[in-house]
Structures are given as structure tokens and as C-alpha cells.
Amino acid sequence: MLFRSSDQLESVERVSRERGHEYTDLSLLTDGLRAEREQGITIDVAYRYFATPKRKFIIADTPGHTQYTRNMVTGASTADVALVLVDARKGMTEQSRRHAFIASLLGVPHMIVCVNKMDLVDWSESVFEGIRAECTEFATRLRVRDLTFIPLSALSGDNVVQRSVNMPWFDGAPLLSHLERLHVASDRNLVDVRFPVQYVVRPQSHETRDYRGYAGTVASGVLKPGDKVRVLPGGQETTIATIETADGPLEEAYPPMAVIVTLKDEIDISRGDMLCRPANAPAVLQDLDAQICWMDESAALTPGKTYGIKHTTRTARAVVKEIAYRIDINSLHRVEG
């Protein structure tokens, strides 16, 4: 897809020749670090932007190797769609299971399993169907709302942008067409108003000495001037006066818009506070259960130890009481304790 919309092809062709390839290694479009290009693997998260006449895209190319799993979590944390690459010759591996599980854990609403390198299995429908059955069985134990399978060959471009003439048995859309038609607007929660305050705006000028605005990104729900809101954790209630952006005032704001909200009353609000509806407020708790993806290889998560915990823009200290169970990523079975 980037091949069709990137101006970096000449550089990629040159590096491919330097590495002795007889073909253009398109993975170099997203492998930006020198170490990545030298080793032929993805290490860091590479963000690339492109657009078609129908939609704008941001690709977060994340590493597949186990030692760089934390970078994969970073890239997937804000994604609307997860593309899980599966080698047609190998089927589901520990790596692909790990990626599918993490995408599910992070709540990515759409998952597309791209069965790649179909050219190396003679475009076999039976190979594709076998992998689809294996992945579908695994996905039944995940929280995946929308699961799609596409057979393709990234090297030759089959089913990437154009339909493949080598796989007439596949009646689905090619990858780019599927992404263009994917409906993501309904994935946003427009009911439960949650506006975490990121920054308090207090201009230091005589003309605006009484101005106080609260900047942040709308996490969920819809905000409008005149709406009643409650400030947590303090519990004060007030009314939204205006909603502002750099382009002017708004009549409403919804996810993932970044805005400045002003209130009719002067209330002590700081970074980390949250605006919500009085009748639909989140619970304020001292104790919670959480599913954690632990990344620190040098130290284990230890019950009784104090850690920093970050929720939107608020940071606090927390003590781990106990570990109820661990999850085997390959089988998804729970290991107690």
C-alpha cells in the first residue's frame, strides 16, 4: 500500500540492491532504524502516513520478535484495526498468537488476519482455509468483535491493492479496499462522557486575566455548551460555557477531538481531573482488578510492592495485592498464582 503512495521507492530500491536482493524489499519502507535495515527485522514502531481518495491512514509497523513485544504494545494501543501477518507456510505461530492476544487485550475492535506468502504455497485454497480454521478456533477465546481473513502476497501485490488473478477462489475484497470500507465511527463510545483534563490554560495577559480553560482530548461521549458536568474526583458540578479549538468555537465535541472547555463556575480543577455527566459518572475506587501486560524483563511484578499507575492524565501510587492468574499466550489457559 505504501508502495503505491510513497515517494521513498528509489531509496528502498537502492538499499535492496546494497543488501544483494534481486527484488525490491518493500519492508524497508517502514524499517526506519539503521539496526532494523541491517538485521532485516522491525525493532521500533514506525509510523507512516498515506491517503487514498476515500480515506487517510496511519500505519504503525510494529515488531514481531518476542524481545520487542513492548514496542508492539505501544503501536497497537491507539489502533482501530490490527493487521496480523501469518506466513502461509507456517500457519499460526507463537508470534502471531501473541500479537492477536495483545490486540484483543488492548481492545482493538477490528482484526484482519493477512495470510501472506501465498505465492510460496502455490496459491493453495486448502492451505488458506486450514489457517483460517486454526485462527478462528484461537480467536473464539479472544475478545475480537470483527475478524476478517485475506490471502495475499505482499511481494507480488496479490490482494493488497488489486484483486489477485492467482486466487480466483477468494471472493473477498483486497486489503486496501477492505480498509477503505471498514466502518470505524461506530467504534467510538458516544454515550459515556469522559473528558480527562490534560492542561489548565491560563493566559498571562491583561485582556485574558480571568480566562480559565481546560485542554484535553475527548475520550468518550459528546460534549456541548450548556451541558451539566461533574468534576472528578472532587465531585463539584457545573455547566460547560464554551468548547474551543484553534479554528474557533464548536457546538459539540466528540472522540478523539482535542479541545479546550471553559466552565461557567470557577472551580479548582487541575491536570488529571475528569469531566463527566452527573448521572453517568465513573466509580471512584480505591481497589480495582486489572489485566496487565508486563514488559519488564529485569524485574517481575511482585505482590506487596508499590508501583506507579497512570490513568489518562492522572498518576498515582498503587500496591499490588495479589496476582490471581497468569495467561499462557499459546493456549490462553489460566495459570493460577
Please report, for each region that a protein language model flagged, where it lies by residue.
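Residue-level signature of catalytic and energy-coupling elements of molecular machines
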Residues: 1, 12, 40, 61, ...
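P-loop NTPase switch module centered on the Walker A-proximal segment
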Residues: 1-67, 79
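Active-site phosphate-binding and catalytic loops of NTP-dependent enzymes
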Residues: 18-24, 31-43, 138-147, 180-193, ...
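C-terminal effector/interaction modules appended to NTPase cores
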Residues: 52-55, 203-337
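Conserved Switch II/interswitch segment of TRAFAC-class P-loop GTPases
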Residues: 55-57, 62-68, 77-100, 108-129
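Canonical P-loop GTPase G-domain recognition
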Residues: 109, 121-187
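Accessory interdomain/linker segments of ATP-dependent helicases and helicase-like nucleic-acid enzymes
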Residues: 155, 172-211, 215, 230, ...
